[in-house]
């Protein structure tokens, strides 16, 4: 196989580790892209959109064009400040973004905004606005959006550095939920998660449906977790009670065995951590292959 590598610089701010990897400023420097038809769409962490012909990856210049949107004006009208994005998803000619927001009381939340997709102007409204009122900014937000069945989306919500809320079924930190795109109602699919950066939905060759996710542990204990929806159970993956990692200060308050304490064991865990990221599954005739990216 022959590969061609080219480097392109987008007209957005680049990651700056001098701020520290937990800094809000770097959250605004995380950018996301998606393809639709023969076009590639990119959104910056500050909410600016561009697009270009995907074939331009094979040339010397992307020749990107600005894609206007009402995003900043809409959030200002709703008394929110954009603190960063967590995903971009295009489905059924609609564009969805997950956003970290600060309200006028300087509390934080995560939400999903949607717009009919076109190349003239994106006009956003809230699809999902839980207004979680988290006291402090956190990078452990999850925020992955993927397509699901029956006119629904899957959405991961991280621990938000509020571990006392993760095991509470009435609160959203540490959950994976499904959201109906029409009536905006949501349903819990699992809890006890930490920071689910990878999320994927698939059916095997027998028609069974699965949700698989990858999530960051503390120091060690990165996990891949799988939920067989055939069982129709609300699975609990154990955070912050059970983990195969330890705290960064060296303390270890966690139960290392999940099952013995009533929690779901991970499909696989990694200690030391690998910096796990996105995940996907490919169906084969006899088995399914899981692909996960990482910083290792």
Listing of model-derived features with the role each one plays in the protein:
Residues 57-93, 131:
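Blade-loop segments of beta-propeller domains
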Residues 2-14, 22, 36-73, 116-120, ...:
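Beta-propeller domains
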Residues 16-50, 84, 274-283:
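Beta-strand-rich domains and repeat architectures in extracellular enzymes and scaffolds
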Residues 20-27, 76-80, 128-137, 187-192, ...:
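Surface loop/turn motifs at the tips and blade-to-blade linkers of beta-strand repeat domains
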Residues 48-52, 104-114, 165-166, 173, ...:
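Structural motif
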Residues 79-86, 106-147:
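Asp-box/WD-like beta-propeller blade repeats and closely related beta-sheet repeat scaffolds
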């Amino acid at each position: 196989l022959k590969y061609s590598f080219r480097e392109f610089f987008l007209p957005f701010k680049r990651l700056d580790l001098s701020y520290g990897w937990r800094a809000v400023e770097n959250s605004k420097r995380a950018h996301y892209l998606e393809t639709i038809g023969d076009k590639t769409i990119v959104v910056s962490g500050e909410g600016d959109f561009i697009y270009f012909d995907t074939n331009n990856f094979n040339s010397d210049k992307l020749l990107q064009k600005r894609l206007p949107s009402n995003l900043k004006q809409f959030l200002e009208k709703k008394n929110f400040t954009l603190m960063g994005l967590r995903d971009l998803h295009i489905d059924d000619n609609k564009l969805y973004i997950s956003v970290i927001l600060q309200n006028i009381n300087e509390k934080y939340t995560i939400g999903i905004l949607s717009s009919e997709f076109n190349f003239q102007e994106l006009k956003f409204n809230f699809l999902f606005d839980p207004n979680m009122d988290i006291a402090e900014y956190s990078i452990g937000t999850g925020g992955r959006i993927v397509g699901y069945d029956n006119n629904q989306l899957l959405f991961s919500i991280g621990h938000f550095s509020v571990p006392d809320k993760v095991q509470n079924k009435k609160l959203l930190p540490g959950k994976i939920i499904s959201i109906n795109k029409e009536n905006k109602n949501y349903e819990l699919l699992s809890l006890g998660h930490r920071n689910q950066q990878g999320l994927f939905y698939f059916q095997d060759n027998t028609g069974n449906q699965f949700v698989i996710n990858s999530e960051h542990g503390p120091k060690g204990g990165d996990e891949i977790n799988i939920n067989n929806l055939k069982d129709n159970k609300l699975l609990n993956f154990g955070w912050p009670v059970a983990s195969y990692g330890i705290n960064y200060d060296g303390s270890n308050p966690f139960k290392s065995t999940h099952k013995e304490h009533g929690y779901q064991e991970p499909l696989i865990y990694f200690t030391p951590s690998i910096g796990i990221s996105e995940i996907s599954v490919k169906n084969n005739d006899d088995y399914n292959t899981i692909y996960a990216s990482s910083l290792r």
